[in-house]
């Protein structure tokens, strides 16, 4: 028990040192993260809820919507290779695939390098053990989309907690739950074989990650 407490103290100290030396520069996500992502509109409409996987080194993202989330005729399964500017919309049931160009490559899984650090706060209680979470708040603009965003990440670890996107056409709220620093199956970042040979569909220059979520 004493060993566990000592490790917690050491870990907290290391986090404090890392925070002090960061000079409020944008932190970087762990190499691999996975968990549940929920997206709603500011009007309160549920837009999507499902499992995400993110590879920060290769900048690849997979999101598979929970089929039990809502009464829908189709469910989202997308794979995005941001560095390559490719978005795959996958239909595993019918083994079909749609492949689009993605010119705009910023997203909420990674803090943009030009983000502004707003503050550091505690959610919950800072004085009661395991009853609080220290987070850092970031914000910035996406002029190409005529939009702005805000993000909150854990102070130590840079795990996503929540995010918001405010644009001319839509406002979105993102929440992240049960985030782990691993991905069970690395193959989630590999497009299925039936996506090979599919012709690219050209998309507008402002086509983005945020266009995936709509009523």
Placement of each model-derived feature along the sequence:
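Short, solvent-exposed coil/turn segments at beta-strand boundaries
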Residues: 29-33, 53-62, 78-86, 131-133, ...
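Intrinsically disordered, low-complexity segments enriched in polar/charged residues with Gly/Pro
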Residues: 38-41, 66-67, 74-76, 125, ...
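Gly/Pro-enriched, hydrophobic low-complexity segments
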Residues: 131-198
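N-terminal leader/targeting segments and the immediate start of mature chains
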Residues: 1-60, 71, 94-95, 125-128, ...
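Acidic, glycine-rich loop-and-strand cores that form catalytic or ligand-binding grooves
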Residues: 106-134
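Intrinsically disordered, low-complexity boundary segments flanking structured domains
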Residues: 20-25, 103-108, 123-125, 163
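An acidic-aromatic
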Residues: 49-115, 165-175
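Disulfide-rich extracellular modules and peptides
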Residues: 29, 89, 99-101, 158-160, ...
């Amino acid at each position: 028990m004493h060993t566990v407490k000592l490790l917690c103290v050491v870990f907290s100290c290391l986090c404090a040192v890392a925070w002090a030396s960061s000079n409020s520069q944008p932190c970087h996500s762990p190499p691999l993260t996975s968990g549940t992502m929920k997206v709603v509109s500011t009007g309160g409409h549920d837009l999507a809820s499902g499992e995400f996987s993110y590879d920060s080194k290769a900048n690849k993202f997979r999101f598979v919507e929970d089929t039990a989330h809502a009464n829908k005729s189709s469910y989202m399964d997308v794979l995005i290779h941001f560095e390559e500017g490719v978005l795959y919309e996958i239909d595993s049931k019918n083994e079909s695939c749609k492949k689009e160009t993605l010119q705009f490559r910023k997203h909420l899984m990674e803090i943009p390098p030009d983000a502004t650090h707003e503050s550091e706060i505690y959610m919950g209680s800072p004085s009661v053990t395991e009853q609080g979470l220290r987070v850092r708040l970031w914000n910035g603009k996406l002029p190409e989309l005529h939009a702005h965003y805000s993000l909150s990440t854990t102070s130590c670890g840079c795990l996503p907690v929540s995010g918001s996107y405010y644009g001319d056409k839509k406002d979105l709220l993102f929440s992240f739950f049960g985030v782990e620093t691993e991905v069970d199956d690395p193959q989630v970042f590999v497009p299925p074989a039936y996506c090979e040979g599919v012709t690219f569909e050209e998309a507008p220059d402002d086509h983005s990650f945020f266009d995936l979520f709509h009523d």
